[in-house]
Protein backbone atom coordinates (compact mmCIF):
# COMPACT_ATOMS: atom_id res chain seq x y z
CA UNK A 1 0.00 0.00 0.00
CA UNK A 2 2.87 2.35 0.82
CA UNK A 3 4.41 1.66 -2.57
CA UNK A 4 1.09 2.45 -4.22
CA UNK A 5 0.84 5.78 -2.37
CA UNK A 6 4.45 6.55 -3.20
CA UNK A 7 3.80 5.96 -6.88
CA UNK A 8 0.70 8.14 -6.83
CA UNK A 9 2.55 10.96 -5.11
CA UNK A 10 5.40 10.84 -7.60
CA UNK A 11 2.95 10.87 -10.51
CA UNK A 12 1.03 13.83 -9.05
CA UNK A 13 4.26 15.71 -8.40
CA UNK A 14 5.43 15.22 -11.96
CA UNK A 15 2.08 16.17 -13.51
CA UNK A 16 1.49 19.24 -11.36
CA UNK A 17 4.95 20.75 -11.35
CA UNK A 18 5.76 20.05 -14.97
CA UNK A 19 2.44 21.52 -16.04
CA UNK A 20 4.11 24.90 -15.84
CA UNK A 21 5.99 24.05 -19.02
CA UNK A 22 2.83 22.94 -20.86
CA UNK A 23 1.20 25.42 -23.22
CA UNK A 24 -2.57 25.60 -23.24
CA UNK A 25 -3.95 28.30 -25.47
CA UNK A 26 -7.68 27.64 -25.43
CA UNK A 27 -8.25 31.42 -25.34
CA UNK A 28 -6.74 33.61 -28.05
CA UNK A 29 -4.17 36.21 -27.19
CA UNK A 30 -6.26 39.35 -27.46
CA UNK A 31 -3.50 41.82 -26.59
CA UNK A 32 -3.54 43.50 -30.01
CA UNK A 33 -7.32 43.91 -29.72
CA UNK A 34 -6.97 45.65 -26.36
CA UNK A 35 -4.23 47.94 -27.67
CA UNK A 36 -6.51 49.12 -30.47
CA UNK A 37 -9.37 49.55 -27.99
CA UNK A 38 -7.20 51.67 -25.70
CA UNK A 39 -6.01 53.83 -28.61
CA UNK A 40 -9.60 54.52 -29.65
CA UNK A 41 -11.08 55.10 -26.19
CA UNK A 42 -8.32 56.74 -24.16
CA UNK A 43 -9.16 60.43 -23.40
CA UNK A 44 -5.53 61.55 -23.44
CA UNK A 45 -4.97 60.20 -26.94
CA UNK A 46 -8.28 61.69 -28.10
CA UNK A 47 -7.26 65.06 -26.65
CA UNK A 48 -3.97 64.96 -28.55
CA UNK A 49 -5.81 64.13 -31.77
CA UNK A 50 -8.19 67.06 -31.40
CA UNK A 51 -5.28 69.37 -30.67
CA UNK A 52 -3.61 68.20 -33.87
CA UNK A 53 -6.80 68.74 -35.87
CA UNK A 54 -7.10 72.26 -34.46
CA UNK A 55 -3.57 73.08 -35.61
CA UNK A 56 -4.36 71.68 -39.06
CA UNK A 57 -7.30 74.07 -39.25
CA UNK A 58 -5.00 76.93 -38.21
CA UNK A 59 -2.60 75.99 -41.00
CA UNK A 60 -5.40 76.00 -43.55
CA UNK A 61 -6.54 79.43 -42.37
CA UNK A 62 -3.06 80.92 -42.67
CA UNK A 63 -1.15 81.89 -45.79
CA UNK A 64 -4.04 83.77 -47.40
CA UNK A 65 -4.39 87.42 -48.28
CA UNK A 66 -6.11 89.73 -45.79
CA UNK A 67 -9.62 90.82 -46.62
CA UNK A 68 -9.86 93.81 -48.97
CA UNK A 69 -10.97 97.13 -47.50
CA UNK A 70 -14.02 98.97 -48.84
CA UNK A 71 -14.44 102.66 -48.12
CA UNK A 72 -17.54 104.76 -48.79
CA UNK A 73 -17.83 108.52 -48.41
CA UNK A 74 -21.17 110.30 -48.88
CA UNK A 75 -21.46 114.08 -48.91
CA UNK A 76 -24.95 115.24 -47.79
CA UNK A 77 -23.99 118.61 -49.16
CA UNK A 78 -22.08 118.20 -52.41
CA UNK A 79 -18.50 119.38 -52.18
CA UNK A 80 -17.63 121.94 -54.87
CA UNK A 81 -14.70 120.91 -57.03
CA UNK A 82 -13.05 122.51 -60.00
CA UNK A 83 -14.99 120.34 -62.46
CA UNK A 84 -18.20 119.69 -60.59
CA UNK A 85 -19.56 118.86 -57.19
CA UNK A 86 -18.49 115.64 -55.45
CA UNK A 87 -21.38 113.72 -53.85
CA UNK A 88 -20.04 110.17 -53.38
CA UNK A 89 -16.69 108.36 -53.19
CA UNK A 90 -16.28 104.56 -53.25
CA UNK A 91 -12.87 102.93 -52.81
CA UNK A 92 -11.49 99.36 -52.65
CA UNK A 93 -8.00 98.57 -51.32
CA UNK A 94 -6.15 95.23 -51.14
CA UNK A 95 -3.07 94.77 -48.95
CA UNK A 96 -0.21 92.58 -50.23
CA UNK A 97 2.63 91.43 -47.95
CA UNK A 98 6.12 91.03 -49.35
CA UNK A 99 6.73 88.16 -51.74
CA UNK A 100 6.98 84.81 -49.93
CA UNK A 101 5.47 86.03 -46.65
CA UNK A 102 2.23 84.07 -47.04
CA UNK A 103 4.09 80.91 -48.03
CA UNK A 104 6.40 81.19 -45.01
CA UNK A 105 3.40 81.69 -42.71
CA UNK A 106 1.62 78.63 -44.06
CA UNK A 107 4.79 76.52 -43.92
CA UNK A 108 5.35 77.46 -40.29
CA UNK A 109 1.79 76.52 -39.33
CA UNK A 110 1.99 73.22 -41.24
CA UNK A 111 5.22 72.24 -39.51
CA UNK A 112 3.72 73.11 -36.13
CA UNK A 113 0.74 70.90 -36.98
CA UNK A 114 3.15 68.11 -37.94
CA UNK A 115 4.89 68.46 -34.58
CA UNK A 116 1.50 68.13 -32.86
CA UNK A 117 0.81 65.05 -34.98
CA UNK A 118 4.07 63.43 -33.87
CA UNK A 119 3.24 64.26 -30.26
CA UNK A 120 -0.13 62.57 -30.68
CA UNK A 121 1.58 59.53 -32.25
CA UNK A 122 3.98 59.32 -29.33
CA UNK A 123 1.10 59.41 -26.84
CA UNK A 124 -0.67 56.56 -28.64
CA UNK A 125 2.50 54.45 -28.87
CA UNK A 126 3.27 55.08 -25.19
CA UNK A 127 -0.27 54.02 -24.35
CA UNK A 128 0.19 50.74 -26.24
CA UNK A 129 3.30 50.05 -24.17
CA UNK A 130 1.41 50.80 -20.95
CA UNK A 131 -1.29 48.35 -22.01
CA UNK A 132 1.35 45.67 -22.61
CA UNK A 133 3.01 46.50 -19.30
CA UNK A 134 -0.18 45.91 -17.34
CA UNK A 135 -1.06 42.90 -19.51
CA UNK A 136 2.18 41.02 -18.80
CA UNK A 137 2.12 41.99 -15.12
CA UNK A 138 -1.38 40.52 -14.91
CA UNK A 139 -0.31 37.33 -16.72
CA UNK A 140 2.69 36.94 -14.39
CA UNK A 141 0.39 37.13 -11.36
CA UNK A 142 -1.95 34.56 -12.95
CA UNK A 143 1.02 32.24 -13.47
CA UNK A 144 2.17 32.67 -9.88
CA UNK A 145 -1.33 31.90 -8.63
CA UNK A 146 -1.42 28.76 -10.74
CA UNK A 147 1.95 27.60 -9.37
CA UNK A 148 0.92 28.15 -5.75
CA UNK A 149 -2.39 26.32 -6.24
CA UNK A 150 -0.52 23.39 -7.78
CA UNK A 151 2.00 23.28 -4.94
CA UNK A 152 -0.77 23.49 -2.38
CA UNK A 153 -2.46 20.53 -4.01
CA UNK A 154 0.82 18.65 -3.84
CA UNK A 155 1.14 19.57 -0.16
CA UNK A 156 -2.35 18.21 0.53
CA UNK A 157 -1.50 14.97 -1.28
CA UNK A 158 1.60 14.61 0.89
CA UNK A 159 -0.55 15.27 3.94
CA UNK A 160 -3.00 12.51 3.00
CA UNK A 161 -0.19 10.04 2.36
CA UNK A 162 1.44 10.90 5.68
CA UNK A 163 -1.86 10.53 7.51
CA UNK A 164 -2.37 7.08 6.04
CA UNK A 165 1.19 6.15 6.89
CA UNK A 166 0.74 7.33 10.47
CA UNK A 167 -2.45 5.33 10.95
CA UNK A 168 -1.24 2.17 9.23
CA UNK A 169 0.61 -0.63 10.89
CA UNK A 170 3.50 0.11 8.54
CA UNK A 171 4.23 3.42 10.26
CA UNK A 172 7.93 4.10 10.39
CA UNK A 173 9.86 5.53 13.20
CA UNK A 174 9.93 8.95 11.53
CA UNK A 175 6.16 9.24 11.23
CA UNK A 176 4.97 11.91 13.65
CA UNK A 177 1.63 13.56 14.21
CA UNK A 178 3.51 16.86 14.59
CA UNK A 179 4.32 16.69 10.87
CA UNK A 180 0.61 16.86 10.15
CA UNK A 181 0.35 20.05 12.19
CA UNK A 182 3.34 21.55 10.40
CA UNK A 183 1.74 20.80 7.05
CA UNK A 184 -1.49 22.45 8.21
CA UNK A 185 0.51 25.52 9.24
CA UNK A 186 2.23 25.54 5.84
CA UNK A 187 -1.15 25.16 4.14
CA UNK A 188 -2.39 28.26 5.98
CA UNK A 189 0.55 30.17 4.51
CA UNK A 190 -0.44 28.93 1.05
CA UNK A 191 -4.03 30.07 1.59
CA UNK A 192 -2.84 33.55 2.58
CA UNK A 193 -0.62 33.78 -0.50
CA UNK A 194 -3.47 32.67 -2.76
CA UNK A 195 -5.85 35.24 -1.27
CA UNK A 196 -3.23 37.98 -1.53
CA UNK A 197 -2.46 37.24 -5.20
CA UNK A 198 -6.17 37.01 -6.02
CA UNK A 199 -6.65 40.51 -4.58
CA UNK A 200 -3.69 41.76 -6.64
CA UNK A 201 -5.15 40.19 -9.78
CA UNK A 202 -8.52 41.79 -9.12
CA UNK A 203 -6.92 45.22 -8.71
CA UNK A 204 -4.78 44.73 -11.83
CA UNK A 205 -7.85 43.79 -13.89
CA UNK A 206 -9.71 46.87 -12.70
CA UNK A 207 -6.73 49.08 -13.55
CA UNK A 208 -6.47 47.43 -16.98
CA UNK A 209 -10.13 48.09 -17.73
CA UNK A 210 -9.84 51.70 -16.61
CA UNK A 211 -6.85 52.09 -18.92
CA UNK A 212 -9.14 50.95 -21.75
CA UNK A 213 -11.70 53.52 -20.54
CA UNK A 214 -14.44 50.98 -19.88
CA UNK A 215 -16.23 49.60 -16.77
CA UNK A 216 -13.70 48.30 -14.27
CA UNK A 217 -15.34 44.88 -13.92
CA UNK A 218 -15.46 44.13 -17.65
CA UNK A 219 -14.33 40.66 -18.72
CA UNK A 220 -10.71 40.31 -19.86
CA UNK A 221 -9.80 37.41 -22.16
CA UNK A 222 -6.41 36.16 -20.97
CA UNK A 223 -4.30 33.35 -22.46
CA UNK A 224 -3.84 30.31 -20.23
CA UNK A 225 -0.05 30.50 -20.22
CA UNK A 226 2.52 33.26 -20.17
CA UNK A 227 4.99 32.49 -22.94
CA UNK A 228 8.30 34.22 -23.53
CA UNK A 229 8.30 36.31 -26.68
CA UNK A 230 10.95 35.85 -29.32
CA UNK A 231 13.54 38.60 -29.26
CA UNK A 232 13.53 40.57 -32.52
CA UNK A 233 16.53 41.43 -34.65
CA UNK A 234 17.24 44.89 -33.29
CA UNK A 235 18.42 47.68 -35.58
CA UNK A 236 19.26 51.17 -34.42
CA UNK A 237 18.39 52.57 -37.86
CA UNK A 238 14.77 51.48 -37.36
CA UNK A 239 14.59 53.39 -34.09
CA UNK A 240 16.15 56.52 -35.55
CA UNK A 241 13.84 56.36 -38.56
CA UNK A 242 10.50 55.75 -36.82
CA UNK A 243 10.66 57.25 -33.33
CA UNK A 244 8.00 59.99 -33.04
CA UNK A 245 9.99 62.11 -30.57
CA UNK A 246 12.79 62.55 -33.12
CA UNK A 247 10.29 63.31 -35.87
CA UNK A 248 8.58 65.84 -33.61
CA UNK A 249 11.87 67.66 -33.00
CA UNK A 250 12.58 67.66 -36.73
CA UNK A 251 9.16 69.19 -37.40
CA UNK A 252 9.74 71.82 -34.71
CA UNK A 253 13.11 72.68 -36.24
CA UNK A 254 11.50 73.11 -39.67
CA UNK A 255 8.80 75.30 -38.10
CA UNK A 256 11.43 77.59 -36.56
CA UNK A 257 13.27 77.78 -39.89
CA UNK A 258 10.02 78.94 -41.48
CA UNK A 259 9.52 81.36 -38.57
CA UNK A 260 12.95 82.87 -39.23
CA UNK A 261 12.11 83.30 -42.90
CA UNK A 262 8.78 84.86 -41.93
CA UNK A 263 10.55 87.37 -39.68
CA UNK A 264 12.82 88.32 -42.56
CA UNK A 265 9.84 88.77 -44.88
CA UNK A 266 8.10 90.96 -42.33
CA UNK A 267 11.11 93.25 -42.45
CA UNK A 268 10.39 94.00 -46.10
CA UNK A 269 7.87 96.59 -47.35
CA UNK A 270 4.24 95.66 -47.82
CA UNK A 271 2.05 97.43 -50.32
CA UNK A 272 -1.58 97.93 -51.20
CA UNK A 273 -3.34 98.44 -54.51
CA UNK A 274 -6.78 99.89 -54.95
CA UNK A 275 -9.13 102.02 -56.95
CA UNK A 276 -11.43 104.90 -56.04
CA UNK A 277 -14.54 105.98 -57.90
CA UNK A 278 -15.87 109.52 -57.42
CA UNK A 279 -19.44 110.47 -58.32
CA UNK A 280 -19.80 114.14 -59.29
CA UNK A 281 -22.64 116.49 -60.17
CA UNK A 282 -22.48 119.35 -62.58
CA UNK A 283 -21.54 122.64 -61.06
CA UNK A 284 -24.03 125.33 -62.24
CA UNK A 285 -21.38 127.92 -61.59
CA UNK A 286 -18.13 126.40 -62.77
CA UNK A 287 -14.93 127.98 -61.61
CA UNK A 288 -12.93 130.05 -63.99
CA UNK A 289 -10.50 127.98 -65.97
CA UNK A 290 -12.54 124.76 -65.62
CA UNK A 291 -12.99 122.53 -68.63
CA UNK A 292 -16.69 122.52 -69.64
CA UNK A 293 -16.55 118.96 -70.99
CA UNK A 294 -15.45 117.61 -67.60
CA UNK A 295 -18.04 119.42 -65.52
CA UNK A 296 -19.95 116.76 -63.55
CA UNK A 297 -17.94 113.84 -64.99
CA UNK A 298 -17.39 110.81 -62.68
CA UNK A 299 -13.79 109.79 -62.15
CA UNK A 300 -11.69 106.66 -61.46
CA UNK A 301 -8.52 107.04 -59.46
CA UNK A 302 -6.01 104.15 -59.01
CA UNK A 303 -4.24 104.11 -55.65
CA UNK A 304 -1.14 102.50 -54.19
CA UNK A 305 0.14 102.44 -50.63
CA UNK A 306 3.52 101.19 -49.34
CA UNK A 307 4.60 100.55 -45.74
CA UNK A 308 8.10 101.57 -44.74
CA UNK A 309 9.65 99.12 -42.22
CA UNK A 310 12.14 101.58 -40.82
CA UNK A 311 11.85 100.35 -37.23
CA UNK A 312 14.02 97.21 -37.32
CA UNK A 313 14.29 96.35 -33.64
CA UNK A 314 11.20 94.15 -33.58
CA UNK A 315 12.12 92.38 -36.82
CA UNK A 316 15.68 91.73 -35.70
CA UNK A 317 14.48 90.40 -32.34
CA UNK A 318 12.04 87.99 -33.99
CA UNK A 319 14.72 86.72 -36.35
CA UNK A 320 17.22 86.25 -33.52
CA UNK A 321 14.62 84.44 -31.43
CA UNK A 322 13.94 82.05 -34.31
CA UNK A 323 17.68 81.38 -34.71
CA UNK A 324 17.99 80.57 -31.00
CA UNK A 325 14.98 78.27 -31.19
CA UNK A 326 16.56 76.45 -34.15
CA UNK A 327 19.77 75.96 -32.21
CA UNK A 328 17.90 74.75 -29.12
CA UNK A 329 15.83 72.29 -31.16
CA UNK A 330 18.90 70.86 -32.87
CA UNK A 331 20.59 70.34 -29.51
CA UNK A 332 17.43 68.74 -28.14
CA UNK A 333 17.39 66.39 -31.14
CA UNK A 334 20.98 65.29 -30.49
CA UNK A 335 20.27 64.86 -26.78
CA UNK A 336 17.17 62.76 -27.46
CA UNK A 337 19.03 60.70 -30.04
CA UNK A 338 21.84 59.96 -27.56
CA UNK A 339 19.30 59.00 -24.89
CA UNK A 340 17.50 56.64 -27.26
CA UNK A 341 20.76 55.06 -28.38
CA UNK A 342 21.76 54.53 -24.75
CA UNK A 343 18.37 52.95 -24.08
CA UNK A 344 18.79 50.79 -27.18
CA UNK A 345 22.18 49.43 -26.04
CA UNK A 346 20.87 48.78 -22.52
CA UNK A 347 17.85 47.02 -23.99
CA UNK A 348 20.03 44.51 -25.81
CA UNK A 349 21.91 43.68 -22.61
CA UNK A 350 18.70 43.39 -20.56
CA UNK A 351 17.16 41.01 -23.10
CA UNK A 352 20.20 38.73 -22.95
CA UNK A 353 20.14 38.84 -19.15
CA UNK A 354 16.41 38.00 -19.02
CA UNK A 355 16.86 35.01 -21.34
CA UNK A 356 19.71 33.67 -19.20
CA UNK A 357 17.58 33.99 -16.07
CA UNK A 358 14.69 32.13 -17.69
CA UNK A 359 17.02 29.28 -18.66
CA UNK A 360 18.45 29.22 -15.13
CA UNK A 361 15.05 29.08 -13.43
CA UNK A 362 13.81 26.39 -15.84
CA UNK A 363 16.85 24.29 -14.97
CA UNK A 364 16.43 24.85 -11.24
CA UNK A 365 12.71 24.00 -11.38
CA UNK A 366 13.50 20.73 -13.16
CA UNK A 367 16.09 19.86 -10.52
CA UNK A 368 13.70 20.73 -7.70
CA UNK A 369 10.99 18.56 -9.26
CA UNK A 370 13.35 15.60 -9.17
CA UNK A 371 14.46 16.53 -5.66
CA UNK A 372 10.86 16.52 -4.44
CA UNK A 373 10.28 13.06 -5.87
CA UNK A 374 13.37 11.74 -4.09
CA UNK A 375 12.53 13.49 -0.83
CA UNK A 376 9.08 11.93 -0.76
CA UNK A 377 10.57 8.48 -1.23
CA UNK A 378 13.19 9.12 1.43
CA UNK A 379 10.60 10.55 3.84
CA UNK A 380 8.42 7.46 3.59
CA UNK A 381 11.51 5.33 4.14
CA UNK A 382 12.44 7.49 7.13
CA UNK A 383 15.70 8.86 5.68
CA UNK A 384 14.55 12.50 5.23
CA UNK A 385 12.46 14.96 7.20
CA UNK A 386 9.38 17.01 6.47
CA UNK A 387 11.52 20.13 6.85
CA UNK A 388 13.44 19.16 3.72
CA UNK A 389 10.21 18.73 1.74
CA UNK A 390 8.73 22.03 2.90
CA UNK A 391 11.95 23.90 2.24
CA UNK A 392 12.15 22.44 -1.27
CA UNK A 393 8.54 23.43 -1.94
CA UNK A 394 9.31 26.98 -0.82
CA UNK A 395 12.32 27.10 -3.14
CA UNK A 396 10.15 25.71 -5.92
CA UNK A 397 7.54 28.46 -5.47
CA UNK A 398 10.24 31.11 -5.31
CA UNK A 399 11.85 29.89 -8.54
CA UNK A 400 8.50 29.66 -10.29
CA UNK A 401 7.73 33.23 -9.22
CA UNK A 402 11.12 34.43 -10.44
CA UNK A 403 10.67 32.62 -13.74
CA UNK A 404 7.25 34.17 -14.38
CA UNK A 405 8.65 37.59 -13.47
CA UNK A 406 11.58 37.04 -15.84
CA UNK A 407 9.29 35.93 -18.68
CA UNK A 408 7.11 39.01 -18.12
CA UNK A 409 10.24 41.19 -18.01
CA UNK A 410 11.46 39.74 -21.32
CA UNK A 411 8.07 40.37 -22.91
CA UNK A 412 8.16 43.96 -21.67
CA UNK A 413 11.65 44.45 -23.07
CA UNK A 414 10.41 43.29 -26.46
CA UNK A 415 7.45 45.65 -26.09
CA UNK A 416 9.85 48.46 -25.22
CA UNK A 417 11.78 47.87 -28.44
CA UNK A 418 8.50 47.80 -30.37
CA UNK A 419 7.67 51.12 -28.75
CA UNK A 420 10.98 52.56 -29.91
CA UNK A 421 10.33 51.52 -33.54
CA UNK A 422 6.65 52.57 -33.33
CA UNK A 423 5.28 49.12 -34.13
CA UNK A 424 1.88 49.81 -32.57
CA UNK A 425 1.22 53.06 -34.41
CA UNK A 426 -2.49 53.32 -35.21
CA UNK A 427 -2.45 56.98 -36.23
CA UNK A 428 -3.26 56.04 -39.83
CA UNK A 429 -6.46 54.32 -38.67
CA UNK A 430 -7.84 57.42 -36.91
Regions found by a protein language model. Give the residues of each.
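Positively charged n-region of N-terminal signal peptides that target proteins for export
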Residues: 1-4
Amino acid sequence: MIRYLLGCMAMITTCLLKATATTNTSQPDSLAHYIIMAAKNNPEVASGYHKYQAMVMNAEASGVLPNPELSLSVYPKPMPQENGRQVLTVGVMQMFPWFGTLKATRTMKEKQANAAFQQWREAGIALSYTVQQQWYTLLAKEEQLKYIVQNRQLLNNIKQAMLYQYKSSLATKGSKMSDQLRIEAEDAVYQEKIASIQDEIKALKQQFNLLLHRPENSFIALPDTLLARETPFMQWQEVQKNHPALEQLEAQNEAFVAQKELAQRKGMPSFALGVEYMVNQKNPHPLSGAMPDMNGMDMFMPMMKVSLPIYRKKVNAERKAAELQIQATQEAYLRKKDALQTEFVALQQQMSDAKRKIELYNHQITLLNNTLNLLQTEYINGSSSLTDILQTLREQIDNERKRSDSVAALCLLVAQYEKMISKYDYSSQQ
